[in-house]
Amino acid sequence: MRVMLKATLDTEKANEAIRSGKMPELMKDALDHLRPEAAYFGPLGGRRTALLVFDMADSSDLPATGEPFFTQFNAEVEVFPVMNGEDLRKGLAQLGRTSGVS
């Protein structure tokens, strides 16, 4: 299932990682682990945030998914299902067939 992970980094932990020069390596490790199809980084709500879209093969993968962000950055992590345009078209077509909506 395609999911989006939103990791809102703790400012002090992120500052420490930047000052120590470890931020690039820590982010690379997290990205290598998740292998996202898309990754975006920027300020949301005044805090450094990562938005990653990737395939979660099984719900049992959830604990390990956010762990690098929890342990390295004391981040607030949210994971939720998302769709691309093709997924949405397919879902709406199924909805139309099953709900009787014309």
Regions found by a protein language model. Give the residues of each.
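Conserved, structured core segments of small domains
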Residues: 1-102
